Amino acid sequence: MLREPVGLFFTLIFPPLLVAILGTIFGNDPTPQFDGKGFVDATLPAMSSLVVAIMGILILPATQLQLRESGALARLRATPLKSWTYVAADVTVHFLVGMTGVVLALIVGMLMFDVRAQGSVLLVLVAGACGLIAFLALGYTLAAVYPSAAAATGIGNGVMIVLMITSGAFIPMEALPSGVRHATQFSPLRHLVELMQGL
């Protein structure tokens, strides 16, 4: 993964950049729309949760399939390296990179927009870590289902757009049609956003 600049961009640069851009556009002055909180105050945990989803839906499946298509995984099987050692190392790398992206997004919000923590930052990080573990498991499942890295990227981008729009991170759930709101009950990102916003 460390050799994939696109993956690193979307996990380490895109989230804090998104916080900076949206925070600059909408500001962080308290508004009734967010119950007296600023835009960044209200949405920062949700925006940081996007790192978790991007890692599981986009980055991990594409990375695994690229390794499979290049023959790297087959060559690894021919070495004395145990399978569980590779899996443990791969999970660890993706987990650490994902959590770094979450932390960077939070730091940008706190430093640039003076975000006032509504609860425990530690709990937000714990929730992000639990969500990341779940999304990594989903990512490995998708990697086993997708036929190719190109399919993983194409389908993953479409899925991510839908998940972002219906997560409640940017568009209030009340603004969505009732049928869409009902369907989002099955969205893992919506539940992660609600968890992190509530901490």
Enumerate the predicted regions with their spans:
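Short helix-to-coil transition segments within interhelical loops
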Residues: 75-84, 145
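Hydrophobic alpha-helical transmembrane segments of polytopic membrane proteins
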Residues: 123-146, 164-167
